[in-house]
């Protein structure tokens, strides 16, 4: 079996990460004189990383964030001096999600509540949890549409079973 046939077989097995990394990893194995087991381990790591990346991307898309650029790295804590930085980073650990606790941001418009909500949602996704982000009016519209369409129970099941529901 040659490289092209092996790549095709790997894709059939749904191992696209291994297929994509096969040629460069073969060169690396020859150059670094990798043992067969080390070579295989590297290919498997490529596949695992690709799957993890795709899962993360899928969960971010499914979350429905309004602005994907809102992360804790992009939040300006100097803008709002009253923001408890330590508490925000504690929330970013996601412990409140695993402990089934609620969180609530209160404050006037323009103080960073939406940014922080999305940033914390992103951090929680990176820890392996599912997140659903909806603006309040969108959530109510979707619920009304589900009611009219006779799918209210399904919609409520979808919304209430996600580990973190963010209503902005």
Q: How would you name each of these model-derived features?
A:
Residues 81-89, 131-160:
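Short glycine-rich substrate-engagement loop in P-loop NTPases that contacts/grips substrate
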